[in-house]
UniProtKB/Swiss-Prot annotation:
The modification N-acetylmethionine is found at M1. It comes from Saccharomyces cerevisiae (strain ATCC 204508 / S288c). Its main location: nucleus. A zinc finger (C2H2-type) spans 346-368, 374-397. This is Transcriptional activator/repressor MOT3. InterPro entries: Znf_C2H2_sf, Znf_C2H2_type. The keyword Acetylation applies. Transcription factor that affects the expression of a large set of genes. Recognizes and binds to the consensus sequence 5'-[CAT]AGG[TC]A-3' in the promoter region. Plays a major role in the repression of a specific subset of hypoxic genes (e.g. ANB1, DAN1 and HEM13) under aerobic conditions. Acts synergistically with the transcription factor ROX1 to recruit the general repression complex SSN6-TUP1 to the promoter of hypoxic genes. Represses transcription of ergosterol biosynthetic genes. Negatively regulates pheromone-induced gene expression. Can act as a transcriptional activator (e.g. GO terms for biological process: cellular hyperosmotic response; cellular response to osmotic stress; negative regulation of ergosterol biosynthetic process; negative regulation of transcription by RNA polymerase II; positive regulation of transcription by RNA polymerase II; regulation of transcription by RNA polymerase II. Gene3D superfamilies: Classic Zinc Finger. GO terms for cellular component: chromatin; cytosol; nucleus. Keywords: Acetylation, Activator, Amyloid, Metal-binding, Nucleus, Prion, Repeat, Repressor, Transcription, Transcription regulation, Zinc, Zinc-finger. It is found in: Nucleus.
Length: 490
């Protein structure tokens, strides 16, 4: 009886354990469904207006300078991040100020500190209004001259459609308000990817912000449309962001004057659904002084390319200091170009190294990636950069490379090498005797065949020495190596 009772207890315990596991799995599945609800609603662009990118296919051939960065351009979308990470978003944003309507400059400045990205052109043309603003943004611009009807929600820095959606707890509209579509190539730095978190939590954060500060939201809305109107403090963000930069706040209407603003600058961020979205950084409210006018305007300062500021010219004691040029309202993110003797202008934001050329910086940025995309065809090891793989193949697999060169009918001109003759006297003497015994044909055979060591392996010197000695042609070696890399890295 005791044994039967014990067996029954064990069976009951196993059944209870299985039921608990089944319940946990159901809870996890429900939680995941809830987390993705907002993303799925946003991906349905039928409810939020036309999306010029919705019909564009994924493009997996475009290679970012850093595979851990997220690249999206107007004609392609990529998925460099694993699917299980696509439920995350980046928390910080900037407002893209593009105010062509002078009557709405104050409203633009009020929203310039908003942590949400919008692309509101503030004109009658709806083509420049992003999916995040769709209809409400255009409707709000018609009421900018009416102080009582302006719903820009300055105290919370939340756009009208976001404020309405949050007040009504409309998750579909609220989620749509947080999504904006990119217009330029701007990769997200890898160092900012640790600050991703769930969009549902993000929107809930602004629900709380609206509910706690909904009294007097429109009390100070657009009191006067003048250049002295200052932007309110941005809405509180997560406390774990540690990137603090020294910024300047540029008011578009005060003649280009720059005011000091000690608020931390947060990088633009992306929101992910089944694809990654890249948002533009605001060039106007946050003026970055480390910008090179030579670089294209669509490249965001402080992201990939940091340029070193121009050193101030030294002045004589009897002469007043040279005036600092004021910023241009049209191109407020430009500063004078570095002097001609300042060669290293492209600076890496991760390790502070500087480079003469932008292409060199892009190649260097791959070294900061954790991904290794270049496969060695011989040992199957992986390298972060192509030049590292080329170096690896030449140094670690010299014999394999020599064999591959022979297969491609590459001529080895050992007769032109002095050091190779000194290092391999016996082999070269044998080759010379065979060449003299058979005339010109023997000489050609000796030039086309690599001498072997006693163990039967190929020529034991490295490829660089062979190229320097004139045994191998540098272009032939490069061509064979590139063909190997391409064939094994498709």
């Amino acid at each position: 009886m005791n044994a039967d009772h014990h067996l029954q207890q064990q069976q009951q315990q196993r059944q209870q354990h299985q039921q608990q596991q089944h319940q946990q799995q159901q809870h996890q599945h429900q939680h995941q469904q809830q987390q993705h609800t907002i993303l799925q609603n946003v991906s349905n662009t039928n409810n939020i207006g036309s999306d010029s990118l919705a019909s564009q296919p994924f493009n997996t051939t475009t290679v970012s300078s850093n595979k851990d960065d997220v690249m999206v351009n107007s004609g392609a979308r990529e998925l460099p991040m694993p699917l299980h990470q696509q439920q995350y978003i980046y928390p910080y944003y900037q407002y893209t100020s593009n105010n062509s309507n002078n009557n709405n400059v104050t409203a633009g400045n009020n929203m310039s500190a908003s942590p949400i990205v919008h692309n509101n052109s503030n004109n009658s043309n709806n083509s420049n209004i992003s999916a995040s603003d769709y209809t409400v943004a255009n409707n709000s611009t018609s009421n900018n001259n009416n102080n009582n009807n302006n719903n820009n929600n300055n105290n919370n820095n939340i756009h009208p459609n976001q404020f309405t959606a949050a007040a009504n707890m409309n998750s579909n509209a609220a989620a749509a308000a947080y999504y904006s579509f990119p217009t330029a190539n701007m990769p997200i730095p890898q160092q900012d990817q640790q600050y991703m978190f769930n969009p549902a939590s993000y929107i809930s954060h602004y629900y709380s912000a609206v509910n706690s500060n909904n009294n007097g939201n429109n009390a100070a809305n657009n009191g006067s449309n003048n250049s002295s109107h200052s932007a309110p403090a941005p809405a509180p963000g997560p406390p774990h962001h540690h990137h603090h930069h020294s910024n300047t706040h540029n008011n578009l209407n005060n003649g280009g004057a720059v005011n000091t603003n000690n608020a931390p600058q947060h990088h633009p961020t992306i929101i992910t659904d089944q694809f990654q979205f890249q948002l533009q950084q605001n060039p106007s409210p946050n003026l970055n002084l480390n910008i090179n006018p030579a670089q294209p305007l669509h490249l965001p300062p402080g992201w990939k390319i940091n340029t070193m500021p121009q050193p101030r010219p030294t002045t004589a004691p009897n002469h007043p200091p040279a005036p600092v040029p004021s910023s241009n309202p049209v191109a407020s993110n430009l500063v004078p170009a570095p002097s001609s003797d300042h060669k290293y202008i492209h600076q890496c934001q991760f390790c502070e190294k500087s480079f003469k050329r932008k292409s060199w910086l892009k190649r260097h940025l791959l070294s900061h990636s954790q991904q290794r995309h270049f496969l060695c065809p011989w040992c199957l090891s992986r390298q972060k950069r192509k030049d590292n793989l080329l170096q690896h193949m030449k140094l670690k697999h010299t014999n394999y490379l020599l064999d591959e060169l022979k297969k491609n009918n590459i001529i080895f001109n050992y007769n032109n090498s002095s050091s190779s003759n000194n290092n391999n006297d016996n082999n070269n003497n044998n080759n010379s005797n065979s060449a003299s015994g058979s005339g010109g044909a023997g000489a050609a055979a000796a030039a086309a065949t690599a001498p072997e060591n006693e163990d039967g392996n190929g020529y034991d010197t490295n490829i660089k020495t062979l190229i320097n000695d004139g045994v191998l042609n540098k272009d032939d070696v490069k061509r064979v190596l590139n063909n190997l890399i391409v064939s094994h890295n498709k």
